[in-house]
Amino acid sequence: MGYTCFCIMNTASSSSPACGVPAISGRIVGGTDAVYGEWPWQVAVTTANSLCGGSLINEQWVLSAAHCFDNSISPGNYKVSLGRYKFGESIASSVTVVVEKFTKHPNFIKPGDRGDIALVKLKSPVTFTNYIRPICLPNASVTFPSGMECWVTGWGTRRYGENLPSINTLQEVMTPLIDYKQCDQMYHIDSSTSSYTIIIQEDKICSGYAEGGKDSCQGDSGGPLVCEANGTWIQAGIVSWGDGCALKNHPGVYTLVPAYESWIKSYISDVKFVSDDQISGSPDLAPQHCGLSRNLYQASCVLICMNMTYA
């Protein structure tokens, strides 16, 4: 039993919100279910037979993993659900949009390769709400230090090999970052792969614990790995692959987003990227980095606390 608090923010303007700033916050440390509206950039990318995650980066574009998309399947057969909390259950805040096109990075050929990143254009733009908001993207200058605690979210399975449930609450887990060199060393422990063979490439970042226990899993692919800096959430990675789920010395592997700034910009000219200076908290470089006026970020917060019991 304990108190869970939600912060409902009332912005001073009805214009587009800043990226990476959820209207609702509240987290149960060590829990698994996310708070409704806590991760408003999280999307589900689905076909009749598949589920992946993704992140909203502006009104009409989503970032996901290349391995989630099959070139033999028409883009119109992919759908993107936004503002959703329980997968498989429609609510008033959620919308579903058909995909107009998807673009996979040319370096990607098969899972485990470099370039496991895809841009997804929605057939029509979405309206931002408290439950549908974009995530901030880091530019190529941004580095994410090992040990930084970040969050991964998705509707995937909780254990490797499980079938995806028909209705599943959005899950969240916090894990520390691991740089690709250290991660590569971990994957070589008790491995038959030669130590001279690179398993984790430089366009990746890992997140997890040496002892295992917390990780993304099946169905989470393409979803965001996000880190908080001065009240703004930045997407560090995209769920790419892993050996099982949450195994010892096998942390989750993510495509490193800042490595692909120029590629993303080549397709989306108006997407805004955050720099190291903006993340460091300079008073002149706060959330207005998304190209919006400063008065958008003058906000009041109504705090609602509920006494809840968890099994």
Spans of model-derived segments:
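Protease-domain processing segments flanking chymotrypsin-fold serine proteases, especially trypsin-like
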Residues: 1-63, 77-79, 84, 275-311
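Extracellular trypsin-like serine protease catalytic domains
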Residues: 20-29, 42-46, 148, 154-157, ...
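Conserved H-D interstitial segment of serine endopeptidase catalytic domains
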Residues: 21-25, 62-65, 69-110, 180-188
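Extracellular/periplasmic catalytic domains that process cell-envelope and extracellular macromolecules
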Residues: 34-38, 56, 72-74, 91, ...
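Short conserved beta-strand and strand-loop elements enriched in small hydrophobics
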Residues: 43-45, 78-88, 137, 149-154
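Solvent-exposed coil/turn segments that connect beta secondary-structure elements
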Residues: 48, 67, 83-86, 107, ...
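Conserved active-site neighborhood of the chymotrypsin/trypsin-like protease fold
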Residues: 62-66, 114-139
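Active-site substrate-binding loop(s) of clan PA
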Residues: 106-109, 125-174
